[in-house]
């Protein structure tokens, strides 16, 4: 399973690249989508590689992401009880394992918002106009995407930047 994060905005972008980002549901900076790895997805990612970063997400990071940032329609949090009713999985860990192993697609879960909103990363991005291979942020980063996602999930802070009580 691939985690894809948009790191650059819309200004000065070619229309076909913007359309591809729209098809991937990456319309805003710091939005994340979870995609299955196939030839079509890889081709689309190569087209928008200067505006996004992606890599393989692991079970631990996906579990934290589902607990803290995944929402149902209407901006409701995903609780353990609703998780069991909607997906049939008893815990976040079981759902994360099934998603990573490809047993279920994230888009097949009913009433879940397909885009996950994140905070900007703690300590910031590296150079966003430079590829990850050359010391920047854009493009394919493999397993290192997990470190970036963990820096973007700030514990105790909701989606509006306010401390949760």
Curated annotation (Swiss-Prot):
Q: Name one GO biological process term.
A: translation
Q: Which keywords does UniProt give here?
A: Ribonucleoprotein, Ribosomal protein
UniProt key word Ribonucleoprotein: yes
Entry-linked InterPro entries: Ribo_uL30_ferredoxin-like_sf, Ribosomal_uL30, Ribosomal_uL30_arc, Ribosomal_uL30_euk_arc, Ribosomal_uL30_ferredoxin-like
* Covalent S-S links between cysteines: none
Family, according to the entry, reads as follows: Belongs to the universal ribosomal protein uL30 family.
Q: How does it assemble?
A: Part of the 50S ribosomal subunit.
Q: What is this protein called?
A: Large ribosomal subunit protein uL30
Taxon lineage: Archaea, Methanobacteriati, Thermoplasmatota, Thermoplasmata, Thermoplasmatales
């Amino acid at each position: 399973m691939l985690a894809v994060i948009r790191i650059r905005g819309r200004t000065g972008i070619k229309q076909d690249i913007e359309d591809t980002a729209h098809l991937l549901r990456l319309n805003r900076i710091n939005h994340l989508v979870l995609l299955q790895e196939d030839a079509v997805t890889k081709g689309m990612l190569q087209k928008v590689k200067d505006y996004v970063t992606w890599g393989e997400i692991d079970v631990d990071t996906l579990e934290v992401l589902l607990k803290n940032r995944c929402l149902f329609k209407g901006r409701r949090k995903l609780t353990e009880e609703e998780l069991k009713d909607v997906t049939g999985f008893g815990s976040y860990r079981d759902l994360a394992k099934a998603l990573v192993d490809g047993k279920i697609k994230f888009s097949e879960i009913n009433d879940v918002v397909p885009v996950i909103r994140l905070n900007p990363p703690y300590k910031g991005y590296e150079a966003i106009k430079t590829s990850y291979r050359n010391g920047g942020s854009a493009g394919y980063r493999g397993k290192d995407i997990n470190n970036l996602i963990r820096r973007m999930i700030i514990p105790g802070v909701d989606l509006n930047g306010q401390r949760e009580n």
